[in-house]
Regions:
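Charged, often Cys/His-bearing segments associated with DNA-binding zinc-finger transcription factors
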Residues: 1-55, 95, 292, 309-329
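Short, well-ordered secondary-structure "scaffold" segments embedded in the functional core
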Residues: 1-6, 64-330
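Short helix-capping/turn signature of helix-turn-helix
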Residues: 57-61
Length: 330
């Protein structure tokens, strides 16, 4: 393991232990971090620090379970069990760590943080999808659905983040051939988003999404945009790039996400979610990586364009009013 990321793994230990708020969680964590399986070291004991470092070190480095077991002088099955147990524990914490703001005060604070970026008003979050490369699924008849537009096998991770790159919502495990607007419809947040954005808020998405009162998109540039529309798009991109940076930071911090070699897509999805939990914990602890390693230039982001359904086109005409009102501010 690279020293830098092993150090990061060690820094995650205390964050992981502190993330459980109740005594029952603490007891559960103790059981998970000290599994009575064939975990053998020289002194026949695996302490919590070693266990956490094994799991976090695996997440933060592009390494294998075999290499982790050799590094910590434990059996392969022990390292495998440790990683699975910590992932399960993190997923149990996810409802408390990855959650959408509910109160009016929370929403106002988040909106003000976004407004401070470029002046774009009433933004509650930024949404997008990203590909995470995986091993080809076992079932050959579905393998082609996991080949993305870059001709690589992957799953899509949909994320919604705040201005500090912290995830509000994560949905993953969907075959990468499915476009972003369809992934949103399939996700749990898809039906809840209109209510969560009441009374005046919205999330920002790229042109892959249909415009909604609660989901604003940029103006498509066919060479005939007005100066006001160009200013709208500029401020929009300056704000929406936060989700690109959130994905970049996630993948930079957890190098295992460069390519996941799990045999089951379900296991892959669980691991991605666990990394997102740790990502949020790190942000809460203000543990950041140098921006130059993950920041994306808004001008370099290529918009995706997909045809919408007829019903979407009708709704778009109604929801265009809000975008026009915001455009008039610029």
């Amino acid at each position: 393991m690279e020293k830098r990321y092993l150090s990061l793994a060690n820094n995650l230990i205390n964050d992981l232990l502190e993330s459980s708020s109740s005594s029952s969680d603490d007891e559960e964590l103790g059981v998970l971090l000290n599994p009575k399986t064939n975990c053998l070291r020289v002194n026949n004991f695996v302490n919590e620090v070693s266990t956490c470092t094994q799991a976090a070190g695996f997440c933060c480095n592009k390494t294998t379970i075999c290499e982790v077991s050799n590094l910590f002088n434990v059996s392969y099955s022990c390292a495998h069990n440790v990683i699975n147990n910590v992932v399960s524990f993190l997923i149990g914490l996810s409802p408390d760590i990855i959650k959408f703001p509910q109160s009016a005060t929370e929403k106002e604070i988040i909106s003000n943080e976004f407004a401070a970026i470029s002046g774009f008003p009433n933004v509650l979050g930024c949404i997008d999808g990203t590909y995470i490369s995986i091993r080809a699924p076992k079932k050959k008849f579905v393998q082609h659905t996991y080949i993305n537009r870059h001709d690589t096998i992957s799953v899509t991770m949909q994320g919604i983040c705040d201005a500090n790159l912290k995830f509000f919502d994560v949905f993953t495990g969907v075959a990468s051939k499915v476009d972003d607007s369809r992934v949103l419809k399939l996700s749990f947040i898809g039906k809840e988003l209109p209510k969560l954005c009441l009374p005046k808020y919205h999330v920002l998405g790229d042109s892959a999404y249909p415009i909604r009162n609660y989901l604003l998109t940029p103006y498509r540039d066919y060479g005939n945009l007005t100066e006001q529309e160009k200013r709208y798009n500029y401020k929009f991109s300056q704000t929406r790039v936060r989700i690109e940076n959130a994905f970049g930071l996630l993948k930079c911090r957890f190098r295992q996400l460069m390519r996941l070699d799990f045999h089951e897509v379900e296991t892959t999805a669980k691991f991605i979610l666990a990394c997102c939990v740790l990502h949020n914990v790190c942000i809460d602890k203000q543990d950041f990586i140098e921006k130059k390693e993950y920041c994306v230039d808004p001008a370099s982001v290529q918009e995706q364009h997909f045809p919408f359904e007829v019903s979407d086109t009708v709704l778009t005409e109604l929801d265009e009013i809000k975008r026009s009102q915001i455009k008039s501010l610029f």
